[in-house]
Amino acid sequence: INWKKIASIGKEVLKAL
């Protein structure tokens, strides 16, 4: 599992909310 990629995607999701 690529945690850095998950973290970056998570940040983008939070921005989109």
From Swiss-Prot:
Position of the signal peptide: none
Purpose of the protein: Antimicrobial and mast cell degranulat peptide. Has activity against both Gram-positive and -negative bacteria (B.subtilis (MIC=25.8 uM), E.coli (MIC=7.3 uM)). Shows mast cell degranulation activity (EC(50)=15-26 uM). Has low hemolytic activity (IC(50)=80 uM). Its mast cell degranulation activity may be related to the activation of G-protein coupled receptors in mast cells as well as interaction with other proteins located in cell endosomal membranes in the mast cells.
Transmembrane segments: none
Cellular compartments annotated: Secreted; Target cell membrane
Single GO MF annotation: toxin activity
Organ and tissue specificity: Expressed by the venom gland.
Further remark: Most of synthetic analogs show a decreased antimicrobial and hemolytic activity.
Keywords: Amidation, Antibiotic, Antimicrobial, G-protein coupled receptor impairing toxin, Immunity, Innate immunity, Mast cell degranulation, Membrane, Secreted, Target cell membrane, Target membrane, Toxin
Disulfide bond annotation, renumbered to this chain: none
GO terms for biological process, alphabetical: defense response to bacterium; innate immune response
GO cellular component, one term: other organism cell membrane
Residues where Leucine amide is found: L17
Organism ancestry: Eukaryota, Metazoa, Ecdysozoa, Arthropoda, Hexapoda
Name the UniProt record assigns to this protein: Mastoparan-like PMM
